[in-house]
């Protein structure tokens, strides 16, 4: 029975320890589950934030791409507009060039050497203007370099203008001198012809040759003057155009000076032509005056024949002079028209050059904007690539975390299953322990009741024997015989334990005396009944412990001579005392 009690106590302690361990493991697993769930929630929140950030980045990238495409389309549209404007300006230039060429073709051609000279001069001017038109496009590109030379060009142009003005004044003075000499020579020749007619008859050929040489010299001088004027005009024009292309102020000044110089040159040329014609007419009149006097003195019969060709020649010369004047007027009108057209073409060229500059600046700005947009596009693409890489890494991390969460879920499910199994095992063990305790307590109660009944019977028998022995002792004489007789009895004396744990022996006269001469061996065993913290202990075990603690009785066995005593100590824990009776 003691072994069974010990085994039951050990089983109960082991079951309680296993229950506590299982509860601790379950608590740890629950904590791990809570931590895993919290980690999973944080990861899900982080994944949602990352998904939102990725969506926002993709949206921003799409917006940036749309804006870049719009900017590129706008730039292409502006570029197309600039190209269309450029083509329109080129068409206008071609039209102006065709108009200039048509004006050249419409100019009347004549066999007159003066007109041919004028035409050549105008052709040279047109060629120079064409060259200048071609050089304008080149000068526009080299304008930055020529800005540094603008001051020097202006100074040289002013010096050349001063020199040309000086030369013109010198030529005018020489022309006036020649006119005065011509006027003086005409009346002097008249007087000589009237005074010495015979001398003129002899020297007709000489005077004609002299007049022809003089006319030739005058013609040569006029040609030289025209050449000098053209040479002076050409550098002045070129310098004026260069200065016009270099600086706007010089351009306006030279444009104002250009018509003046052209008008001055045309006036000087007209004056020289008029002077030459007057010289020729004077020479013809002198010859006409000389020839009649000579013929009247020398050959009077041929005078009407000589006067008729002279008059015809005079009329033809006068008609030719009129025609030349008309042609000059026409040429001057055409020249004015050409100058107007040239000025208009210059204005159109200036406008077109300004428009070209504006288009170039716009194109440069658009190119810069395109470069900036391309750079921003590359940066955004790089950022998108980085975000995609981060998204991939985050997706990989999320997948790994999901796998870990699944593993933890599986582990938690396994641990829950183990916990349930342990709980079931603990319940089964607790039920078995309770059943064993109830069965053991019932058997012990039965045994105790039987022992109590036997003890009561024995006590009754002892009382009977004591009564009989008292009767016999009364008959006996001495106390020693009575003691020996009582010692030899089978029951001996009942041993009772008081509350303090001291043993007392019951004598015949029912007085308690401490048993000193007996030497018992005491065996004490503490049986602690532990209670369950969560669910409590079973009612069977509590009832058995209460019954075992409340029942304090002394039983004695006749067979082995042992007595069991139940007493309660100060701590309230029931203790079992076994006393051996000799």
From Swiss-Prot:
Record gene name: FPP
Coiled coil feature spans: 13-186, 310-477
Signal peptide: none
Tissue specificity as recorded in UniProt: Expressed in seedlings, leaves, flowers, and fruits.
Protein name: Filament-like plant protein
Subunit relationships: Interacts with MAF1.
Keyword annotations of the record: Coiled coil
Biased composition (Basic and acidic residues): 512-527
Family label: Belongs to the FPP family.
Species this chain originates from: Solanum lycopersicum
Biased composition, class Low complexity, residue ranges: 538-555
């Amino acid at each position: 029975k003691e072994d069974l009690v010990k085994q039951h106590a050990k089983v109960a302690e082991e079951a309680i320890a296993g229950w506590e361990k299982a509860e601790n493991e379950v608590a740890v697993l629950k904590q791990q589950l809570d931590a895993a769930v919290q980690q999973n929630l944080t990861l899900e929140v982080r994944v949602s934030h990352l998904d939102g950030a990725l969506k926002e980045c993709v949206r921003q990238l799409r917006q940036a791409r749309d804006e870049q495409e719009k900017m590129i389309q706008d730039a292409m549209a502006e570029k197309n507009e600039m190209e269309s404007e450029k083509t329109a300006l080129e068409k206008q230039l071609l039209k102006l060039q065709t108009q200039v060429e048509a004006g050249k073709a419409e100019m009347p051609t004549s066999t007159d050497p003066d007109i041919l000279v004028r035409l050549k001069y105008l052709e040279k001017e047109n060629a120079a203007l064409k060259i200048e038109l071609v050089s304008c496009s080149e000068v526009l590109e080299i304008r930055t370099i020529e800005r540094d030379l603008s001051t020097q060009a202006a100074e040289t142009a002013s010096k050349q203008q001063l020199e040309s003005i000086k030369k013109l004044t010198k030529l005018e003075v020489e022309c006036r001198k020649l006119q005065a000499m011509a006027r003086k020579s005409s009346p002097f020749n008249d007087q000589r012809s009237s005074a010495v007619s015979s001398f003129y008859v002899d020297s007709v050929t000489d005077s004609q040759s002299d007049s022809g040489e003089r006319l030739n010299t005058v013609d040569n001088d006029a040609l030289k003057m025209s050449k000098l004027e053209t040479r002076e005009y050409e550098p002045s024009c070129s310098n004026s155009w260069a200065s016009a292309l270099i600086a706007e102020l010089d351009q306006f000044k030279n444009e104002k000076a250009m018509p003046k110089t052209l008008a001055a040159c045309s006036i000087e040329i007209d004056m020289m032509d008029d002077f030459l014609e007057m010289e020729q007419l004077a020479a013809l009149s002198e010859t006409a005056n000389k020839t009649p006097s000579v013929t009247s003195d020398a050959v009077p019969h041929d005078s009407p024949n000589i006067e008729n060709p002279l008059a015809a020649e005079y009329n033809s010369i006068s008609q030719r002079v009129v025609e030349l004047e008309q042609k000059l007027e026409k040429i001057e009108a055409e020249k004015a028209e050409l100058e107007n057209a040239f000025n208009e073409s210059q204005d159109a060229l200036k406008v077109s050059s300004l428009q070209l500059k504006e288009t170039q600046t716009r194109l440069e700005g658009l190119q810069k904007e395109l470069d900036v947009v391309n750079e921003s596009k590359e940066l955004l693409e790089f950022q998108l690539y980085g975000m995609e890489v981060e998204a991939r890494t985050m997706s990989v991390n999320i997948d790994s975390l999901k796998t870990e969460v699944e593993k933890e879920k599986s582990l938690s499910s396994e641990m829950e299953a183990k916990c349930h199994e342990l709980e079931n095992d603990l319940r089964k063990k607790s039920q078995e322990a309770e059943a064993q305790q109830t069965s053991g307590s019932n058997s012990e109660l039965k045994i105790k009741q039987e022992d109590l009944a036997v003890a009561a019977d024995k006590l009754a028998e002892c009382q009977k024997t004591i009564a009989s022995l008292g009767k016999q002792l009364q008959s006996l004489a001495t106390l020693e015989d009575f003691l020996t007789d009582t010692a030899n009895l089978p029951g001996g004396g009942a041993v009772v334990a008081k509350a303090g744990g001291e043993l007392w022996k019951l004598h015949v006269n029912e007085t308690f005396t401490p048993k000193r001469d007996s030497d018992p061996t005491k065996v004490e065993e503490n049986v602690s009944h532990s209670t369950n913290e969560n669910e409590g202990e079973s009612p069977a075990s509590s009832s058995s412990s209460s019954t075992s603690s409340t029942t304090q009785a002394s039983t004695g066995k006749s067979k082995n001579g042992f007595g069991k005593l139940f007493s309660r100590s100060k701590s309230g824990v029931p203790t079992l005392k076994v006393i051996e009776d000799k």
